[in-house]
């Protein structure tokens, strides 16, 4: 074998070595990615936080091996359709789990079985539930972050803009809790349902998104009523000075929820004296291959605005 190897031309030997080195590098990289995407956790699926139309509203709780005492809620929603217990892939939130964050996968009833407005109400209850049981999950009730993409980003911003105190005299103790969140990191949200701009979902008359009309209920077909619904369900109309730190990653080639949806929100926030950080992905459409790397950046954002913030009191 050695004689054969020596007999080969030098350029062939170099080529073989280069190929072997490349294959080894690919193998090691794949092994690392597999290890990184599968952290050691304790997972509880299907914790019921409420009901809607006779159906359970559920949260999955993913606790890392070394929790840092801070929770991040993931809005499991795309097109305002949600999954059920176990639907959130661990690999997608691996950077958060490896950062020590306890992850709460908040699911809602998918439209059109429930309306988008119902989903907004229900994810608010989800945050109240998490806060009420903070001690059970080993997290600080005053340091809860939220993340999601697309419809999940929209729901996250509704929490950022409208989440707030519960009802002090509510019979259900969960409803007495606040639904406010303390930091937000999201992907490509829709922020203005009354102005869909250059979106492929724009009907051209100020009406609801073309593919999601049923998701807003029968009143969405009545323009005067839709204007009330659309305004109430759009984060941009609820921007206020008390919003938490917000990070948005958005692609400049997104035709479903164009980048302008985020920049408009940023401009409105600036008018209120609030900074919203946008990271533009050149050529990025409604999702891209390196989103796991962006989740790692989200974890660093939460480090700055949640983990490294001293607990209240």
In which residue ranges do the predicted regions lie?
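Conserved alpha/beta-hydrolase "acid-adjacent" motif
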Residues: 255-264
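Short beta-strand/loop motif that positions the catalytic acidic residue
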Residues: 248-250, 254
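Primarily recognizes the serine-hydrolase "nucleophile elbow" in alpha/beta-hydrolase
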Residues: 128-200
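Catalytic nucleophile-loop/oxyanion-hole region of alpha/beta-hydrolase
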Residues: 84-86, 92, 104-141, 288-293
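N-terminal cap/lid segment of alpha/beta-hydrolase-fold proteins
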Residues: 30-66
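Short beta-strand element of the alpha/beta-hydrolase
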Residues: 69-79
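Catalytic active-site module of serine/aspartate enzymes centered on a nucleophile-bearing elbow/loop
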Residues: 292-313
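Mobile cap/lid helix-loop segments that gate and shape the active-site cleft of serine hydrolases
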Residues: 160, 195-238, 244
């Amino acid at each position: 074998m050695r004689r054969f190897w020596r007999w080969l031309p030098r350029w062939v030997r170099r080529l073989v070595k280069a190929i072997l080195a490349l294959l080894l590098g690919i193998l090691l990289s794949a092994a690392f990615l597999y290890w990184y995407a599968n952290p050691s956790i304790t997972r509880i699926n299907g914790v019921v936080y409420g009901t809607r139309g006779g159906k359970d509203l559920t949260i999955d709780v993913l606790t890392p091996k070394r929790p840092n005492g801070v929770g991040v809620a993931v809005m499991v929603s795309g097109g305002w359709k949600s999954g059920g217990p176990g639907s959130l892939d661990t690999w997608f939130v691996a950077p958060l789990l490896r950062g020590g964050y306890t992850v709460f996968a908040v699911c809602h009833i998918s439209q059109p079985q429930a309306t988008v407005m119902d989903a907004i109400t229900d994810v608010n209850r989800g945050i109240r539930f998490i806060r009420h049981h903070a001690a059970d999950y080993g997290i600080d009730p005053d340091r809860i972050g939220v993340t999601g993409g697309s419809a999940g980003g929209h729901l996250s911003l509704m929490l950022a803009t409208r989440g707030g105190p519960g009802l002090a005299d509510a019979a259900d103790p969960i409803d007495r809790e606040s639904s406010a969140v303390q930091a937000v990191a999201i992907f490509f949200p829709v922020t203005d349902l009354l102005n869909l701009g250059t979106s492929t979902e724009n009907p051209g008359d100020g009406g609801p998104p073309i593919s999601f009309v049923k998701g807003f209920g029968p009143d969405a077909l009545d323009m005067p009523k839709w204007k009330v619904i659309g305004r109430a369900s759009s984060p941009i109309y609820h921007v206020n000075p008390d919003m938490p730190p917000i990070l948005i990653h958005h692609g400049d080639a997104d035709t479903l929820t164009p980048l302008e949806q985020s920049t408009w929100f940023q401009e409105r926030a600036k008018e209120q004296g609030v900074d919203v950080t946008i990271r533009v992905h050149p050529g990025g459409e409604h999702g891209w291959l390196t989103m796991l790397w962006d989740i790692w950046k989200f974890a660093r954002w939460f480090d700055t605005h949640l983990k490294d913030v001293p607990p209240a009191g």
